[in-house]
């Protein structure tokens, strides 16, 4: 499991002063990107690879508590490989720390494809290694 720390910023909130669902999913994606960087994956090369793309094909989020500007978040990421071309990431979002209130739970599902043919392809070795690393019992903390 990886743990990502984040502060809710004013720009993350809507007119009602709370984090909007699309923004919460964006924060989850930010945590995903940080976990890739922690695994020494070059994000520029990863997201611009002409041989492969790994788009999100499904996303969901459930809120249990509102998130307000200035609140500190602790986001737990746990990923699992579903197929040789597919994985999902579960995010648990806590206010303050995991001992605090659970504010939300999100899920994103990703599929590896060839960007030209748009056909599924096997996850690259670096992603299989990332999946193994993120699922170790020892937590890695990301800031």
From Swiss-Prot:
GO biological process terms, alphabetically, are: phylloquinone biosynthetic process
Q: Which InterPro entries match?
A: 4-hydroxybenzoyl-CoA_TE, DHNA_CoA_hydrolase, HotDog_dom_sf
Citing just one GO molecular function, the answer is: fatty acyl-CoA hydrolase activity
Q: Which family does it belong to?
A: Belongs to the 4-hydroxybenzoyl-CoA thioesterase family. DHNA-CoA hydrolase subfamily.
What's the Enzyme Commission number for this chain?
3.1.2.28
Q: Per its database record, what is this protein's job?
A: Catalyzes the hydrolysis of 1,4-dihydroxy-2-naphthoyl-CoA (DHNA-CoA) to 1,4-dihydroxy-2-naphthoate (DHNA), a reaction involved in phylloquinone (vitamin K1) biosynthesis.
Q: Which cysteines are joined by disulfide bonds?
A: none
- Give the record's keywords alphabetically: Hydrolase
Species lineage: Bacteria, Bacillati, Cyanobacteriota, Cyanophyceae, Oscillatoriophycideae
Q: Which reaction does it catalyse?
A: 1,4-dihydroxy-2-naphthoyl-CoA + H2O = 1,4-dihydroxy-2-naphthoate + CoA + H(+)
Instruction: Say which enzyme class the record assigns.
Output: hydrolase
One Pfam family cited in the UniProt record for this chain: 4HBT_2
- Name the UniProt record assigns to this protein: 1,4-dihydroxy-2-naphthoyl-CoA hydrolase
Q: Which pathway?
A: Cofactor biosynthesis; phylloquinone biosynthesis; Quinol/quinone metabolism; 1,4-dihydroxy-2-naphthoate biosynthesis; 1,4-dihydroxy-2-naphthoate from chorismate: step 7/7
- Name the catalytic site residues: 14
Answer yes or no on keyword Hydrolase.
yes
